[in-house]
């Protein structure tokens, strides 16, 4: 049996409801059609507000990771550009702006409020394996201190994760990293590596270095690999450090280019679902809305993966929004959204979603 609170919040995202009134009225309008969702009646406005304020957001976090365990393997895509076989994770954070007068706990700047979603995205499935929701004022590297570390995997991140004590811990755990380094990085070159002929136009530098700043060197005394590439699309040089010395420079460059996938994930969850504005003002309510958005996008990516039709995620969300209370054979609709479904056999019963 599904929780009415979970069903309400999933409806909030699928229907892009802007208030508890919209959620309650929307579900009430589906009288008789809620049984397949695992609830008997639509919750009231006060019930939704109370549950969002009092029910521990970690319950929804647990639901997300349980579903990820069950459905995550289905969402994995075949690698095309990346030739390495190790696990790849993309690390970044995104800010969600809030009105400080309404969300006074969400400190960010003097007159601005925000929460920050620190995220470790699994590359093949494009789904988070770690999310830490904090106040907007928490630095990116601090929000990533407890990310899971998988030996032999590689973590790709931007310059905000130039935290040498943290990188030293990753290295000690057998984790590779590809990090864009800051422009003011102080280092000494130990050895210039030969540039590949085919990559000479985009790969500008491949060298082994040690940090020369005494404080930084104390935090990360081992040698590093530094690769500089030319980003022709944005007309800029990108300089990266890594602790992997066996991959081709072109592999390190391609790994960093794939970091864009986490930006796409953040764009999708903000534009397609409902986390730009919030139906509750407490920290718990905000976290519940974010975790249920993650549950929703996991369900969407699973549906996309089992469909024969080549859905774009945005189109799938739009079609579900238009047909949210239409009784359909889900698999048939996913496979052939523009065809009339066959007539349901007698004594046919709709399955339970949860």
Each predicted region: which residue ranges?
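Major-groove recognition helix of helix-turn-helix-like DNA-binding domains
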Residues: 36-57, 65
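Short alpha-helical linear motifs
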Residues: 46-50, 71-75, 337-343
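Catalytic micro-motifs at enzyme active sites that drive phosphoryl/nucleotidyl and oxygen chemistry
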Residues: 36-37, 76-78, 105-108
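Long amphipathic N-terminal alpha/beta scaffold segment
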Residues: 71-82, 98
């Amino acid at each position: 049996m599904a929780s009415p609170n979970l069903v309400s919040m999933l409806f909030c995202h699928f229907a892009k409801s802007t208030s508890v009134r919209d959620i309650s009225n929307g579900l009430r309008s589906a009288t008789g059609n809620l049984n397949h969702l695992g609830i008997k009646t639509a919750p009231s406005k006060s019930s939704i507000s109370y549950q969002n304020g009092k029910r521990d957001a970690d319950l929804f976090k647990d639901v997300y990771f349980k579903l990820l365990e069950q459905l995550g393997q289905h969402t994995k895509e075949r690698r095309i550009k990346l030739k390495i076989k190790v696990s790849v994770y993309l690390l970044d954070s995104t800010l969600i702006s809030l009105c400080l007068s309404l969300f006074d706990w969400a400190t960010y700047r003097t007159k601005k409020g925000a929460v920050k979603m620190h995220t470790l995205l699994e590359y093949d499935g494009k789904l988070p394996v770690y999310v830490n929701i904090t106040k907007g004022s928490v630095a990116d590297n601090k929000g990533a201190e407890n990310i899971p570390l998988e030996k032999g995997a590689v973590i790709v991140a931007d310059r905000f994760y130039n935290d040498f004590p943290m990188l030293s811990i990753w290295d000690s755990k057998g984790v590779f990293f590809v990090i864009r380094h800051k422009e003011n990085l102080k280092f000494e070159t130990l050895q210039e590596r030969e540039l590949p002929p085919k990559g000479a136009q985009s790969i500008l530098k491949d060298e082994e270095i040690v940090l020369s700043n005494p404080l930084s060197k104390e935090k990360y005394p081992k040698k590093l690999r530094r690769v500089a590439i030319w980003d022709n699309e944005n007309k800029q040089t990108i300089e990266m450090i890594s602790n992997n010395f066996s991959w081709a420079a072109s592999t390190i460059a391609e790994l960093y280019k794939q970091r864009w996938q986490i930006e796409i994930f953040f764009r999708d969850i903000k534009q397609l679902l409902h986390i730009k504005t919030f139906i509750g003002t407490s920290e718990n309510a905000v976290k519940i809305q974010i975790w249920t958005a993650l549950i929703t996008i996991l369900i969407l990516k699973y549906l996309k993966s089992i469909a024969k039709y080549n859905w774009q995620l945005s189109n799938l969300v739009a079609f579900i929004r238009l047909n949210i209370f239409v009784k359909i054979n889900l698999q048939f609709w996913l496979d052939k959204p523009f065809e009339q479904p066959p007539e349901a056999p007698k004594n046919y019963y709709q399955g339970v979603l949860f």
